[in-house]
Amino acid sequence: NFQYGNATLSYYDPETRTVQNEVFFRANGMKLGDVAQSMIIRDGVGWVVVNNSHVVFAIDTNTFKEIGRITNLTSPRYIHFLSDEKAYITQIWDNRIFIVNPKRYEITGYIQVPNMTMESGSTEQMVQYGKYVYVNCWSYQNRILKIDTETDKVVDELVVGIQPTSLVMDCNNKLWTVTDGGYEGSPYGHEAPSLYRINIDDGKFEVE
């Protein structure tokens, strides 16, 4: 629950079909924090993005013990690895995507998002195709960004409906996003939700 600091991590064992709750707390003797937004596993390490605690924890997936953390983040949402020594972390309430070195748990730079204010900044999920990373901009936004990972610059963008909430790529290299349309009374506007399929090669909408 937002602002309650009661995020938890559970583990499901598919062989025994059992669930262990509060595994982070039991392994580390401290709460996970305020809003565990997302998690990925890479090479036996779990990366838990805790949004309103401004931190990303690295944990051993066998013991659930913390092995490191990335701090001084604004309000992190998702992490995407480019290599062992480089990753992107998206943010809400910030007009930057953070560049980090996961081996050193350090912030090494930023990607400035054009035409986005700090107060209404919102970058979310990331999908990679070749050297480009695509990012949907959610809260009070309507864009999908294209980032060149060699230069760490936004090189293009697609305008979609109001508030694209998620982003995936299918087996045919088609990019899909769905929008929530905002809400009634929103200063950014309100419309019916939409589903988009995008040809990644030419940036054209195939389903809208």
List where the protein language model places each region:
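Predominantly soluble domains enriched in secretory-pathway, periplasmic, or organellar proteins
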Residues: N1-E208
